[in-house]
Design a protein with these regions (language model features):
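Internal intein/HINT superfamily modules and their associated LAGLIDADG
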Residues: 1-301
Length: 301
């Protein structure tokens, strides 16, 4: 458990400081300028399944941007990923694949139920290799990636625009923006016996409704046609938070599309059989396995 701010940093908290970063893993290969054997090994080790998975992960929680360094010539590319510290299995794997430095961000001032996070940021030829490798599998951020890679000098003929679906991609997006629910609920009824039942569903959210509709159509084409009614969350009744230094104005927020796959335990289990092998975050994988186990138990003859 993270200790209080005074226990962690008794003499180093600056006025107005809300967070502190701690390096917990240091890269041994930060300054590659040209192609070399270490990069070739990383490229070979970054297999197609991993590339598809991180296409989904970056579409959800990842970021990539170009910038102009103040003391160096030419445009530079920066790729970043930040995940909650206890849901960070994808980030840890990525750090191993590309030998990245991992930072841990802790909140010095308690802020609701906000948890510490882990993050990686990498630039240069590593970032270019990574983005070019996942480019064919990006969906939501493909247009942005096209512009960035063209800026970085990638030949346009290698940047194919068609979109493709895979369960590896969906696993990455699920670990980023998905909910896998398997919970026991107790129902209290007036003058009637209380009963309990399991609540289970699979859900994705995105500010890009077209992206979710592409995923939905792809799953329907594969036979998973047990979606619930699409939802859209709006924020016109959310009040703006004052006194903070980041954008919390609900008037600027895009509506959030919600895609939920329901159905029977058997239907969800059939879907999870395809998806679960590629999931990395432990609690989401466990909820899928619990659903499949429950379905097996209730169907024992």
């Amino acid at each position: 458990m993270i200790r209080t701010q005074l226990e962690l940093f008794p003499q180093k908290i600056k006025k107005g400081q809300r967070t502190k970063k701690i390096i917990i893993r240091k890269s041994s290969s930060n300054y590659f300028k040209d192609w070399n054997e270490s990069l070739a090994f990383m490229a070979r080790n970054f297999n197609p399944g991993d590339r598809k998975y991180y296409g989904g992960m970056i579409d959800g929680d990842g970021s990539f941007n170009t910038y102009l360094p103040t003391k160096r010539k030419g445009i530079k590319l920066m790729v970043g990923l930040e995940l909650r510290h206890d849901h960070a299995e994808p980030l840890l794997k990525l750090a191993e694949l590309f030998d990245l430095t991992i930072s841990k961000k802790v909140y010095l001032i308690p802020k609701g139920n906000t948890q510490p996070s882990l993050s990686v940021e990498f630039s240069g030829i590593k970032a270019k290799l990574f983005l070019f490798s996942i480019y064919p599998y990006l969906l939501e951020k493909k247009e942005k990636a096209t512009k960035v890679l063209l800026q970085m000098g990638c030949p346009e003929q290698y940047l194919l625009k068609e979109r493709q679906f895979s369960f590896e991609y969906l696993a990455g997006y699920t670990d980023s923006e998905g909910t896998v629910c398997f919970s026991l609920q107790h129902h209290v009824r007036p003058q009637r016996p209380t009963y309990s039942s399991y609540h289970m569903y699979y859900q994705l959210t995105s500010n890009d409704g077209g992206h979710l509709q592409f995923i939905k159509k792809s799953l329907i084409d594969l036979g998973f046609n047990h979606f619930r009614k699409d939802q859209k969350r709006t924020y016109e009744h959310v009040k703006k938070r004052e006194g903070v230094d980041y954008n919390t104005n609900p008037q600027t927020w895009k509506p959030t599309s919600v895609l939920r796959l329901g159905g029977t335990p058997a239907q969800l289990s059939k879907f999870y059989e395809q998806l679960e092998p590629f999931i990395l975050i432990k609690h989401k994988k466990e909820n899928m396995l619990h659903t499949m186990k429950y379905n097996h138990i209730i169907n024992i003859r």
